[in-house]
Amino acid sequence: MTPPGKKPARGCAAMPALEVCDLTFTYPGGVAPVLDRASLVVPDGAFALLTGPTGSGKSTLLRLAKPEIAPAGERAGEVLAFGADVRSFLPAESAAAVGYVFQSPDNQIVCDTVWHEMAFGLENLGVPADEMRRRVAETCNFFGMGPWFRAQTSELSGGQRQTLALAATLAMRPRLLLLDEPTSMLDPIAEKAFLGLLFRANRELGITVVVATHAPQAMAEYATCAFAVGEGRVREVELSALAKPRPLAALPARPAPAGAAAVDVREAWLRYDRDGDWVLRGLDLRLIRGEVRALVGGNGSGKSTLLSLAAGVARAQKGRVKNALARSQALLPQSPKAVLACETVRDELTEWAAGSGYGAAEVDAALGELGLTDAADRHPYDLSGGQQQMLALQKLLLCKPGLLLLDEPTKGLDDAARVWVVHAVGAARDAGATVLLATHDMAFVEAVADRVSLLFDGCLTSTETAAEFFAASWLYGRGSR
């Protein structure tokens, strides 16, 4: 058997990089297995796509191939990396065989500087100092990270943070790289740049790549094979058969609301460090009661910061912020785990019932709406990222907030789940809620927004109706939707 960190000798047939054999897995509290005798074979050197509906088991399958993050539960079958059972790997062998990149770099980056993050995993593996410096230098040069090598990780854009997560993983030189929705939080330009780097790692370094994604079309030009996960099984599909995203049906048209402001921001200046760059630079925002406003712009433009400012979570160093609906607001941050704090899915939806005037019937209906009735007794962290996103949003919606602040609410969701979010925002709008959302999903913006504000250089450079925005925009026109 070839050791996990070594290539087979010349003339020998290459083993599959990843082989899943009759894998069955059931989460604690689950009624049915998420994976049921699932099998697949990914050839060495492939760029493979793993597709399927939200909650189909894509993330579970990937995590079971990386023992350090494998979920707890009942398991049968085998997962092999280069012919070896992944559960037999020692830590150094696991790092040399299988690397893993999460959907959110915030779940992966643990150090305060780029250079320390690059060295962190190598230090834990006991790599000698000279070899560590060589690996860090080579990897940073490969990914063009020199200009921001000594930057604070908190100052990086979303694209840079995801590139750092990828580079720090590859510095450990795995032969197989698993990625779970790695571009779902990136703007279109950052997504293209990241996929280009990933493709280079595959082609130039010979690393086998397996990507779980709801947007296979963006990666089809790089892929060599694709698999669909559904009903517990895995089947290979033709790249030409990968479904294009369905258009999102827009909410019923209405005139953009006018009247009093729900949130009024005047001349706001905000930065996170005394000597850091200003994230918001004299920004003005007037959010009208009852409107749905979308914030768009590149990674690092300040969308999340503006949501935090409106919610009172962040404080401006200069300027004024008035929130007339502060007592009735709900914030969905980029990480849904910030909202999820209970032991079971059902408990999440009942946590705020007493103070919000709903009961068991509404909770049961919400579980059914989310397709989580059979998962009601599972731990929320055992759900897929998309299911966690929907659960967190549903938890907020049950409280009927007057102001709903949403940060990337459709990230990592399939078409059906995105449609659910459109309807959820529409129901909140029709109930009189004011909605401020930040997103890279332009089809979602077109479906739900009354007005669109573009952030650039710390300011809102334009605010117009959604129809006006898409008619006038070159970058965000129909080509991006």
Regions found by a protein language model. Name each.
Residues 74-85, 319-329:
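Conserved ABC transporter NBD signature motif
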Residues 131-148, 358-375:
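Conserved ABC ATPase "signature" region
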Residues 177-180, 404-407:
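Catalytic Walker B motif of ABC-type/P-loop ATPase nucleotide-binding domains
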